[in-house]
């Protein structure tokens, strides 16, 4: 064999410039050096602890994996393909080896699979080889009649052509021996046997290293005449590393557990009893674990979690924070608070921050953090959006990530590049707020994600107003990787309640509160009594909130009140508004009902809304009316009433005693409510409604009795209730089973019953191929259709709605600019579920696509608008879609109805 063959092998080319290439040996070394630097300088201590490898072994193994990951490019098939447009390189290779005239099964040997097959053939451990095979984001799969290591023999023409087996085998052996020596291993026998969790994290690190080393801005290509030289190193690596300038892991400024003094320094106020209890528990925990905080609404759970996160990070070397919330709106709402906190974490070191959800780039607060195009210079202290972490796949790799809980749930979903998500969470503190908002489908993914976080020894904080005892037990069992947890332990009805793990044991603490109980009087009423109830309650002034379970009902009630009570301002708030309109309504509500609102701002204001009012909006009503819903959510809604004690002296006399009216139907339950929550929970909640709620004392008993986990049920059962329970349980089971089809395996389970653990076959039948598909996969329900709403005028022009962007026209004969695209993308709205039902969805999408092809074909060429559906309204802000008439109103949001009904009713 000519010793020059190794120097002639190609790894990278430039599709636009046939005069550039990168030799395989250089890309291998670039990736090896980058991976070693990532392992030693970028990984946090917590992530290294999750890997469970001594630093010296980790350094050697990281280098080796980076060096060998593309050994599968050293096959005749790959070299034949890549040199088709590199005549000089091809000519050099042709003097060393023979290219077959054709390949019968070229798709049978992708180069990642070839890498794994070659490493197995040369005696590498299966786990190590499977990492190389998975470096494109998905582990290799064994065929029905062929194992991966047999791929060489089965498709030998792809590997070494005809008659040159010895040549290529000798080359592979030479490459492997060189990489072993450079890494510091004497032979393949020195390579470790790894576990599945270790392999996942190392694969994530390898993917990251490969992407960085493949970026020509960091590691440029060479002229085709240049074979490269060892003299390029170490400068080539130092220059590339400086160009990317990854932020260093978070190192909290408080190196000791946070006390009350440092808490006050951080947040500007001393800790209350609940916050102090969290600080105490965090300080005494001897190992990373799970901490569940159940406490009343408005008690400051966010600050308690951030303080505990600092303590955990300081104790166990976590390099960042993930803070998950139920919706994009709640994530946007808390982003400013968490950014301000993150700024306090930086002294001399810059950190990266990421708002992680589908519409993050449209959040102006987030966009203000975007750095300039150049990021070579030494950054100033603070937090910014590091360019490398802007991709969807890299979302969880930033130091501080604020996003929807979906981002965490996707760590349990079979999805390409899943390993990057695991790498992102393994070195962080994880906080999930409003954990009660997860439905049974999402719970399945959450529990599996928790099992992996427990395996990685990630500190986790879960926040909720309250949890059913069974759910609390399931969360702990998932984190500990246990099948069950002592049932008696979770019958604790103390409140506020802390539950945490200490190794494999579980402890609890009830927080003693010095402040008095807050009493809320409850009464029931029919919907038709609403105007009279409000007239009486607001006779002396004040504000009221009405929370119902469906958008249609909210719109109907708002219409009724505007007609019957014209002297009051009625504000409608739900999810079917354009993003800018909803954001403006949120701003107005926070201004008029927030902590700093004045009596004048609050007076004679009635807000009608859906569940979005119960989620993280820090507003305070003087009087509350709510439609019947499950007890835990009912209490969450009650938490929006008399929330801020600072308003108490100014409330009208008849509203100084908190009072909540629960709307019930005359006969059975409202159909919309049954569709959302199920009949069994509504029935139990109605049966258990007291005449008054004492907060926070009554919260745990009401919730536990409603969910009926304990053996002694407080409600006598009837034949009707038993049937409702069976239907509820069947629905829950069905949701969990549907979710379970696409779950990754638990940490300790292998894909094969015997042999060393390896990633092979680990992600068969992955559910999602795109980010949007992944987000949909971890949420239950019918598929939803999101549209961008614009207006098509009689003169043929397409414009923003008059109150958006000044009603400006947008050209349709060219792709919109980036700024135009961003403004158009903000006009987003989710169509009501009716339009995504099985019998309607194809027709709806077909109509929208045809309309877009006719009028907006050029818009699909704009990257931000590619694949988007645009709903064009006429100058009356209406449109006809799939036999329905849609109308958009700035105050009411989107309404719809069958065309014949709309004509009859004058809509």
Task: Go through the PLM ranges and name each one.
Residues 128, 472, 528-597, 621, ...:
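C-terminal helicase lobe and adjacent C-terminal extensions/tails of nucleic-acid helicase motors
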Residues 319-343, 355-361, 467-471, 551:
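Conserved Walker A/P-loop ATP-binding site and its immediately adjacent core
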Residues 483-554:
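Conserved interdomain linker/interface between the two RecA-like ATPase lobes of SF2 helicase motors
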Residues 257-294:
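Conserved pre-motif I regulatory segment
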Residues 2-253:
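Accessory nucleic-acid engagement/destabilization modules that flank
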Residues 338-399, 405-409:
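A substrate-engagement module of RecA-like helicase motors
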Residues 420-429, 436-508:
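Post-DEXD/H (motif II) to motif III coupling segment of the RecA-like Helicase ATP-binding lobe
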Residues 287-309, 438, 464:
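Walker A/P-loop
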């Amino acid at each position: 064999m000519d010793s020059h063959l190794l120097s002639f092998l190609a790894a990278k080319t430039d599709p636009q410039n046939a005069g550039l290439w990168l030799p395989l040996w250089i890309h291998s070394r670039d990736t090896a050096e980058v991976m070693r630097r990532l392992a030693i300088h970028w990984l946090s201590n917590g992530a290294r602890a999750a890997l469970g490898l001594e630093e010296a072994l980790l350094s050697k193994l990281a280098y080796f994996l980076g060096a060998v990951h593309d050994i599968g490019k050293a096959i005749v098939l790959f070299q034949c393909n890549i040199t088709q447009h590199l005549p000089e390189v091809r000519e050099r290779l042709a003097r060393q080896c023979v290219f077959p005239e054709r390949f019968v099964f070229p798709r049978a040997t992708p180069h990642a699979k070839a890498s794994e097959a070659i490493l197995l053939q040369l005696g590498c451990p299966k786990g190590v080889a499977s990492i190389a095979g998975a470096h494109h984001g998905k582990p290799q799969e064994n065929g029905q009649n062929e194992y991966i290591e047999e791929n060489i023999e089965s498709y030998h023409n792809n590997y070494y052509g005809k008659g040159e087996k010895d040549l290529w085998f000798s080359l592979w052996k030479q490459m492997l021996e060189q990489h072993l020596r450079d890494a510091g291993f004497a032979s393949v026998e020195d390579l470790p046997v790894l576990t599945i969790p270790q392999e996942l994290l190392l694969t994530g690190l390898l993917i990251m290293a490969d992407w960085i080393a493949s970026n020509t801005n960091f590691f440029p290509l060479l002229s085709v005449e240049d074979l490269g030289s060892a003299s390029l190193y170490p400068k080539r690596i130092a220059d590339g590393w400086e160009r990317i300038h990854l932020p260093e892991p978070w190192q909290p400024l408080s190196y000791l557990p946070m006390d009350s003094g440092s808490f006050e320094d951080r947040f500007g106020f001393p800790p209350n009893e609940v916050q102090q209890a969290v600080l105490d528990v965090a300080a005494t925990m001897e190992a990373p674990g799970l901490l569940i905080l159940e406490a009343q609404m408005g008690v400051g759970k966010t600050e308690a979690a951030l303080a505990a996160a600092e303590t955990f990070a300081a104790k166990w070397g976590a390099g960042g924070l993930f803070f998950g919330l139920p919706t994009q709106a709640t994530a946007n709402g808390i982003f400013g608070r968490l950014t301000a906190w993150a700024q306090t974490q930086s002294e001399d070191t810059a950190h990266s921050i990421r708002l992680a959800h589908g519409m993050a780039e449209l959040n102006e607060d987030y966009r203000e953090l975007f750095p300039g195009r150049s990021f070579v210079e030494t950054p100033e202290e603070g937090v910014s959006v590091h360019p490398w972490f802007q991709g969807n796949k890299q979302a969880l790799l930033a130091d501080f990530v604020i996003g929807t809980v979906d981002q965490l749930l996707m760590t349990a979903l079979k999805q390409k590049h899943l390993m990057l998500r695991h790498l992102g969470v393994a070195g962080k503190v994880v906080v999930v707020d409003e954990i009660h908002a997860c439905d049974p489908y999402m719970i399945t993914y959450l529990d599996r994600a928790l099992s992996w976080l427990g395996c990685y020894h990630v500190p986790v904080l879960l926040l909720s107003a309250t949890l059913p005892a069974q759910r609390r037990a399931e969360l702990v069992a998932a984190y500990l990787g246990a099948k069950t947890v002592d049932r008696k332990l979770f019958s604790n009805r103390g409140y506020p309640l802390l539950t945490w793990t200490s190794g494999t044991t579980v402890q609890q603490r009830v927080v003693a509160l010095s402040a008095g109980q807050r009493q809320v009087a409850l009464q029931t009423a029919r919907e038709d009594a609403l105007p009279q109830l409000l007239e009486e309650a607001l006779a002396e002034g004040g504000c009221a909130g009405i929370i119902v379970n469906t958008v249609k009902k909210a719109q109907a009630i708002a219409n009724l009140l505007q007609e019957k009570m014209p002297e009051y301002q009625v504000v409608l708030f739900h999810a079917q508004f354009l993003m800018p309109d909803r954001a403006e309504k949120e701003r107005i509500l926070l201004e008029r009902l927030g902590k700093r609102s004045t009596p004048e701002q609050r007076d004679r204001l009635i807000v009608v809304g859906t569940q979005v009012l119960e989620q993280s909006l820090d507003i305070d009503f003087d009087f509350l009316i709510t439609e019947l819903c499950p007890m835990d959510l009912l209490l969450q809604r009650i938490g929006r009433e008399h929330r801020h004690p600072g308003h108490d002296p100014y409330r009208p006399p008849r509203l100084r005693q908190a009072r909540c009216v629960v709307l019930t139907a005359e006969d059975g339950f409202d159909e919309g409510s049954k569709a959302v929550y199920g009949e069994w929970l509504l029935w139990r909640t109605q049966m258990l409604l007291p005449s008054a709620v004492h907060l926070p004392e009554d919260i745990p008993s009401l919730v536990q009795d409603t969910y009926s986990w304990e053996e002694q049920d407080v409600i006598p059962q009837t034949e009707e209730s038993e049937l409702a329970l069976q239907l509820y349980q069947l629905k829950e089971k069905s949701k969990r089973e549907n979710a379970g089809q696409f779950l990754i395996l638990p940490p300790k389970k292998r894909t094969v019953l015997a042999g060393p653990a390896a990633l092979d076959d680990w992600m068969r039948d992955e559910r999602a191929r795109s980010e949007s598909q992944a987000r949909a996969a971890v949420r239950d329900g019918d598929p939803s259709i999101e549209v961008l709403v614009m207006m098509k005028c009689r003169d043929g022009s397409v414009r923003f709605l008059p109150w958006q962007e000044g009603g400006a026209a947008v050209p349709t004969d060219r792709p919109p600019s980036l700024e135009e695209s961003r403004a158009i993308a903000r006009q987003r709205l989710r169509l009501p579920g009716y339009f995504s039902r099985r019998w309607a969805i194809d027709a709806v999408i077909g109509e929208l696509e045809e309309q877009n092809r006719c009028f907006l074909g050029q818009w699909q060429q704009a990257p931000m608008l590619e694949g988007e559906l645009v709903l064009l309204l006429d100058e009356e802000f209406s449109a006809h879609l799939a036999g329905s008439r849609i109308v958009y109103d700035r105050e009411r949001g989107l309404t719809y109805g069958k065309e014949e009904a709309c004509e009859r009713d004058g809509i």
